[in-house]
Amino acid sequence: MLLPVIMAGGTGSRLWPMSRELYPKQFLRLFGQNSMLQETITRLSGLEIHEPMVICNEEHRFLVAEQLRQLNKLSNNIILEPVGRNTAPAIALAALQATRHGDDPLMLVLAADHIINNQPVFHDAIRVAEQYADEGHLVTFGIVPNAPETGYGYIQRGVALTDSAHTPYQVARFVEKPDRERAEAYLASGEYYWNSGMFMFRAKKYLSELAKFRPDILEACQAAVNAADNGSDFISIPHDIFCECPDESVDYAVMEKTADAVVVGLDADWSDVGSWSALWEVSPKDEQGNVLSGDAWVHNSENCYINSDEKLVAAIGVENLVIVSTKDAVLVMNRERSQDVKKAVEFLKQNQRSEYKRHREIYRPWGRCDVVVQTPRFNVNRITVKPGGAFSMQMHHHRAEHWVILAGTGQVTVNGKQFLLTENQSTFIPIGAEHSLENPGRIPLEVLEIQSGSYLGEDDIIRIKDQYGRC
């Protein structure tokens, strides 16, 4: 059986404003009801696999846990990186965790934010890779190129190992992102693949090769795993140890150096959705080449991508535009300038604007909070608490709160007193009062919260007790 190891780190800044640092693209629902992370998991349906292991940023832990819970795939299988150290250490953490009890699984390493539309072809390639990984090779999946792309690294194939629909080859070399002229030459030669960043190998084989070429990375990761906190859902890697680990990609650390690298070609309608232009290319279009998502309308317009999270967007007489509207930001640009989105993100960071980091709607382990109005002296929030969800028992030094129940039933605790509130009822939480809110019902609890006081920062939440381990 295969152990899927899903790399869910990264910030996805090229899909701003939908993708934010605290809610990056791998958690977005761009093509239906499932997020990209969830699609990565469901795409493996039909293969013999263990429960997936997901590696993510510590700040995304509750997002990942909730999305795995929705798939019934949550079982102490989330590794939390306190800092990003690239793919070689991340895979090492997964391999060390997987071999703790003497097992040596075949690891299928996947990115959480890729699209692979031809699932049968993908599964066929996995089965071919499985044979060679089981024999001790380190297999990488090379994407059959259809254009002289300069945004991907390339893999040059060497000697063919067999003759089949997915002929595996020895890896001749890995190549950095080329200029246009070299990319065209690679495409014409037929000897090169795009580097997908997907791999398969035995866990212990990867660790032995890492020990051979980068023992410093292995040593740091081993120390981190030995000191990890294994909770019910999360495997928390300690910051003070892991921050000493070198930052290195698996290509540089292992794949370019090993004598056992094999590449399996994959022609399965793959995309890493690395820009708004790429998303337009892989999305279904109308007769004029427009992609419309959400509340959008066009007239006499061609080849546009329009995505509206909430507001109506109407476009008339335009072409080749990307228009993305969220609750707190709007992006308008020429589709050919998709790579320049990062300049907007850099501007927001430099000017300490929160829009690069978080959406107006913030996700919590208990549900979500939509910041409707935000001022220095008061905030108005629309809060949704999922069934069974609960605030921590907490208090504030500088703010009071008013809660109005819009829908559902809330169990409120204030200074030890517990009572129920239902629709159209309200309560007041004074400054300094210990308080909590829980949803004991079976439907979402909707609450209008008004915060007022001299200071409204998140660091004025003094947690006393918390079922999510945030104290």
UniProtKB/Swiss-Prot annotation:
Give the originating organism.
Klebsiella pneumoniae
One GO MF annotation is: mannose-1-phosphate guanylyltransferase (GTP) activity
Q: What is this protein called?
A: Mannose-1-phosphate guanylyltransferase
Q: Keyword GTP-binding on this protein?
A: yes
The record's section on NCBIfam families has: GMP_PMI
- Please list the reactions this protein catalyses: alpha-D-mannose 1-phosphate + GTP + H(+) = GDP-alpha-D-mannose + diphosphate
- Keyword Zinc found: no
Top-tier EC class: transferase
What is any one GO biological process for this UniProt entry?
lipopolysaccharide biosynthetic process
Q: Which PANTHER family match?
A: MANNOSE-1-PHOSPHATE GUANYLYLTRANSFERASE
Pathway named in the protein's UniProt entry: Nucleotide-sugar biosynthesis; GDP-alpha-D-mannose biosynthesis; GDP-alpha-D-mannose from alpha-D-mannose 1-phosphate (GTP route): step 1/1
User: Please, which domain of life does this record's source organism belong to?
Assistant: Bacteria
Taxonomic lineage is:
Bacteria, Pseudomonadati, Pseudomonadota, Gammaproteobacteria, Enterobacterales
EC numbers listed for it are 2.7.7.13
* Assigned protein family: Belongs to the mannose-6-phosphate isomerase type 2 family.
The role this protein plays is: Involved in the biosynthesis of the K2 capsular polysaccharide biosynthesis.
Among the Pfam families in the record, one is: ManC_GMP_beta-helix
Q: Which cysteines are joined by disulfide bonds?
A: none
Which keywords label this protein?
Capsule biogenesis/degradation, GTP-binding, Lipopolysaccharide biosynthesis, Nucleotide-binding, Nucleotidyltransferase, Transferase
